[in-house]
Swiss-Prot record:
Protein species of origin: Parasynechococcus marenigrum (strain WH8102)
Protein name: Photosystem II extrinsic protein V
One function term, GO molecular function aspect: heme binding
Signal peptide coordinates: 1-33
HAMAP family: PSII_Cyt550
Chief place where the protein resides: membrane
One Pfam family hit: Cytochrom_C550
Keyword Signal recorded: yes
Subcellular location field: Cellular thylakoid membrane
One GO term (biological process): respiratory electron transport chain
Cofactor descriptive note: Binds 1 heme c group covalently per subunit.
Keyword 4Fe-4S: no
Role according to the record: One of the extrinsic, lumenal subunits of photosystem II (PSII). PSII is a light-driven water plastoquinone oxidoreductase, using light energy to abstract electrons from H(2)O, generating a proton gradient subsequently used for ATP formation. The extrinsic proteins stabilize the structure of photosystem II oxygen-evolving complex (OEC), the ion environment of oxygen evolution and protect the OEC against heat-induced inactivation. Low-potential cytochrome c that plays a role in the OEC of PSII.
């Protein structure tokens, strides 16, 4: 009986040592640490190239606002209504005007234009200009738009090609 108790006691001690180590690996893995470094959180702020660094909390807030306001059509950085135009970095950079910076994305959310910049699509695409089309946009503040833009630009740095890559990643 004593040897059984000793064996159980040793096993329990081993588990007590192992559990915190496993929790630490799950909560603070090297991939997680790299994911939120300053370089990852830094994105172009305007067309001139001025950089802006967001905090992890700001990006998480931007993600929540994005998922609530835009996620119905743009989950994972795709565009459900037009798979040719997503939110991946290359597509944003090739738009006219380029939408690969915070200011340009905020401007687009306020008054969207076609991909070539030739005409307004505010009557078709949710925006601040015509919040009747999609009421979720109605009460968004400029700060929330800025945080969503930050999230859109940071997401591909964290998710890689899965952001804007389409349904093969879901």
């Amino acid at each position: 009986m004593a040897s059984l108790f000793s064996t159980l006691q040793r096993s329990l001690k081993g588990l007590l040592i192992l559990v915190p180590v496993l929790i630490g690996l799950v909560l603070a893995s090297p991939a997680e640490a790299v994911r939120w470094d300053a370089e990852t959180l830094t994105v172009p702020g305007n067309p001139e190239g001025t950089q802006v660094t967001f905090s992890e909390q700001e990006i998480n807030t931007g993600r929540k606002v994005f998922n609530t306001s835009c996620g119905t059509c743009h989950a994972g950085g795709i565009t459900k209504t037009n798979q040719n135009v997503g939110l991946d970095p290359e597509t944003l950079a090739l738009a006219t005007p380029a939408r690969d910076n915070v200011d340009a994305l905020v401007d687009y959310m306020k008054d969207p234009t076609s991909y070539d910049g030739e005409y307004s699509i505010a009557d078709l695409h949710p925006s601040m200009r015509d919040a009747e089309l999609y009421p979720a946009m109605r009460d968004l503040t400029d700060e929330e738009l800025r945080l969503m833009a930050g999230y859109i630009l940071v997401a591909p740095k964290v998710q890689g090609t899965a952001w804007g890559g389409g349904k093969i990643y879901f």
